[in-house]
Regions:
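Contiguous, often N-terminal, cationic amphipathic patches that form binding interfaces
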Residues: 1-77
Length: 77
């Protein structure tokens, strides 16, 4: 599930990153594979953070893809 906050919106624009709330059992490799398969993009890096709400994944896309384009396809912006 995508996360949209002021912080994640700025990350989309400046750092070419998307944020997702993922299953607690998901690994970085699982997240990378899922994002690449679902959106047809190349993922450079995945950072995860465990929070009380669940596990957040910050996914950095390859420069040839734009995070804002993916977000607009999802109807987030």
């Amino acid at each position: 599930m995508p996360i949209v906050t002021e912080k994640t919106y700025l990350m989309m624009e400046k750092e070419n990153k998307l944020a997702f709330l993922v299953d607690r059992g998901a690994t970085k490799g699982d997240i990378k594979s899922a994002v690449e398969a679902l959106f047809g993009v190349k993922v450079v890096k995945v950072n995860v953070m465990n929070t009380a709400e669940g596990k957040k994944a910050y996914v950095k896309l390859s420069p040839e893809y734009r995070a804002t384009d993916i977000a607009s396809k999802l109807g987030l912006i």
